[in-house]
A protein has these predicted regions:
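Signal peptide-directed extracytoplasmic domains
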Residues: 1-125
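Bacterial extracytoplasmic/cell-wall-associated proteins, especially those involved in peptidoglycan
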Residues: 68-71, 83-218
Length: 218
């Protein structure tokens, strides 16, 4: 049946106002009434988009921009403008979006996906913070997120993270420098060519944990 037939059937059944627009996929041999039921229920085609662990904010935006079925409203916006769209104009975006696979329908905006990832991270972070050990040398949720991001960059193996986190916590307790390469690389940014030099490790920076004590700002 074509679209006009479906609308007419819905009209006869008094349900024309319940039809929901969107992209649908129907199996071969489906009946008109089954199609009508699916359209009324709004069971549209959904597409996956994955935000991987360890991704930078730039990589997350690139994944959103590469999703052809999304409506792209974030392109051309600066990170601060994007965070303002989420209601947090002064918040740094790095590490604020929970790594997971999110599903969207055709025409949905990229901002909605970002909102979902942000809200999920906020929820998880709040739960983890409320259940933390009382004697940790970490004062805020943001510091906890920063430490978790550093640990994640140090190893891709989940079974090693607790051990590495323990090393960093002990260093923080005694006022020792963290001395971790990922923070230095992050501070170098796009200038990093894949090789970390002695000069890089000695160059003062808010992110150079071979120079500063404590955690970097983000």
């Amino acid at each position: 049946p074509d679209a006009n037939t479906l609308v007419w059937i819905a009209y006869l059944k008094g349900q024309s106002r319940e039809l929901k627009t969107g992209e649908y996929r129907f199996r071969k041999g489906i009946t008109a009434l089954e199609i009508l039921e699916q359209v009324m229920a709004g069971r549209v085609v959904e597409y996956p988009l994955t935000i991987a662990e360890g991704w930078t904010f730039k990589q997350t935006l690139e994944a959103l921009a590469a999703a052809p079925k999304l409506t792209h409203i974030l392109q051309g916006l600066k990170p601060k403008q994007i965070m303002a769209s989420l209601g947090y104009p002064t918040m740094h975006p790095e590490g604020r979006f929970y790594p997971d696979t999110y599903y969207y329908s055709a025409g949905m905006s990229d901002l909605i996906i970002l909102q979902r990832a942000f809200q999920k991270m906020e929820k998880v972070l709040e739960e983890e913070w409320n259940g933390r050990q009382g004697d940790l040398p970490i004062k805020t949720r943001d510091e906890a997120l920063t430490l978790a991001s550093i640990v994640e960059k140090e190893t891709g193996k989940a079974e090693e993270r607790a051990l590495i986190a323990g090393v960093f916590v002990r260093r923080l307790r005694i006022g020792m420098k963290l001395q971790t390469d990922p923070t230095v690389i992050y501070g170098i940014g796009d200038r990093f060519n894949g090789n970390l030099t002695v000069k890089d490790l000695r160059t003062p920076s808010a992110y150079n944990t071979y120079v500063i004590k404590g955690l970097p700002p983000t």
